[in-house]
Design a protein with these regions (language model features):
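Acceptor-binding helix/loop patch of EC 2.4 sugar-transfer enzymes
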Residues: 39-41, 105-151, 220, 296, ...
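Acidic donor-binding loop of glycosyltransferase active sites
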Residues: 263-276, 289-290
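A charged, aromatic-enriched C-terminal amphipathic alpha-helix characteristic of glycosyltransferases
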Residues: 333-364
Length: 367
């Protein structure tokens, strides 16, 4: 097959492309590299700031658009798959729809349905937009609602979701959300995110008998993602048990340094309001780092995992984070098994070749 993967989130498309190429398919990734992360791509669609950057981007886009014709499959990372306004993107989408055989939409991140369903219907016990029946009103959540509800982004998302040939959800939460939309559930499936396994994942990183706890801080999204709560719990644990634990905090560091800091740790704190580990945590788990975050039973059920339980699941409260961290700090002998299970979990369910085979089956079924 001839496949175009358009857009990028956290290395999903770049990793999937590697797997599809290993299976013998022609696969092109066109993206901006996910902004500052600069993931690999075949066609660079990065948009730089300023009028000159806009002109350069539009020139690149017009030059590459004719190369985006004649594919068996075009997969979009999100309804906002290029750095363009929604009212302009709709014309690019319609062009792709006309000149390629099948369009697949990724439910991999924030879009209209993720915002609307989790604000109004609330199928999840907690999410980026609700905790039970309580609607979250932190600044970022409200900003995202204003961005996606009753705007051109809503129109674009509905149009692409309604006219695409299939929708793939990459996390259980996205699957549960889209499953609430009656007109879309008949053309939707779940496929896990692809991860390229680490070469030396089980190396013991514990230093001086201290458990090393890592947390990455994005100040603008700290409250929205629950990092503020996780950070406070971790700080209090280290203050209470300074001889047993140490905290590694990454904030505003270059991406390469960020990953080195992750790799030096034993635990990673990530995504308090999630049921499942996303790409950051999954990549850490592949290296034998234990994820403290989303590990609800729904996560294991959707992948039919009945044995492994590598994730230290926490509820979206300070008390839950503190209790779970304290337990592992006081029982460090449990770490080795959790690390082993973390690597096995990724191998079973997220290995990029296995995931690529699932996409291959889906794509072939659409042709």
């Amino acid at each position: 097959m001839k496949i175009l993967l358009l857009g990028e989130y956290s290395n999903v498309h770049a990793t999937l492309a590697k797997g599809l190429r290993c299976l013998g398919h022609e696969c092109i990734v066109a993206s901006n590299g996910d902004f500052w992360k600069q993931y690999g791509r075949d066609i660079d669609l990065e948009r730089k700031h300023g009028a000159l950057g806009t002109l350069e981007f539009l020139t690149k886009l017009l030059r590459h658009l004719p190369q985006m014709r004649g594919y068996d499959i075009v997969q979009l990372i999100n309804p906002i798959f290029l750095e363009l306004k929604a009212e302009h993107l709709i014309y690019i989408y319609n062009y792709l729809k006309r000149h390629n055989k099948r369009i697949v939409l990724g439910a991999f991140g924030i879009d209209y349905y993720w915002v609307k369903v989790n604000t109004d219907i609330r199928p999840l016990r907690y999410s980026d937009f609700n905790i039970g029946d309580y609607i979250r009103t932190d600044e970022i959540a409200e900003c995202i609602r204003r961005d996606w509800l009753n705007t051109p982004k809503e129109t674009l998302c509905k149009h692409i979701a309604g006219t695409s040939d299939w929708i793939v959800a990459g996390l259980q939460e996205y699957w549960a959300t889209y499953n609430e939309v009656v007109d879309l559930r008949k053309k939707m499936s779940f496929i896990p995110f692809p991860i390229e396994m680490a070469k030396d994942p089980t190396k013991d990183k514990t230093a001086n008998n201290k458990i090393r706890i890592f947390i990455g801080i994005s100040k603008s999204r700290s409250v929205y993602k629950g990092t503020d709560i996780m950070l406070k719990a971790a700080e209090d644990i280290v203050a209470q048990y300074p001889e047993k634990a140490e905290l590694i905090v990454a904030s505003g560091v270059p991406y390469e340094k960020y990953h080195k800091m992750v790799e030096s740790s034993d635990l990673i704190l990530d995504q308090l309001y999630s049921y499942t580990p996303a790409m950051n945590a999954l990549m850490a788990m592949s290296k034998g780092i234990v994820n403290v975050g989303g590990g609800e039973e729904e996560n294991y059920q959707i992948i039919h995992e009945t044995e492994l339980r590598p994730i230290i699941n926490v509820l979206p409260t300070y008390e839950s984070c503190y209790t779970e961290l304290e337990h592992i700090v006081l029982h460090p002998e449990k770490l080795a098994e959790l690390k082993r299970q973390s690597v096995e979990y990724i191998h079973r369910h997220h290995d990029y070749i296995k995931v690529a085979k699932q996409y291959e089956q889906l794509y072939l079924s659409l042709l």
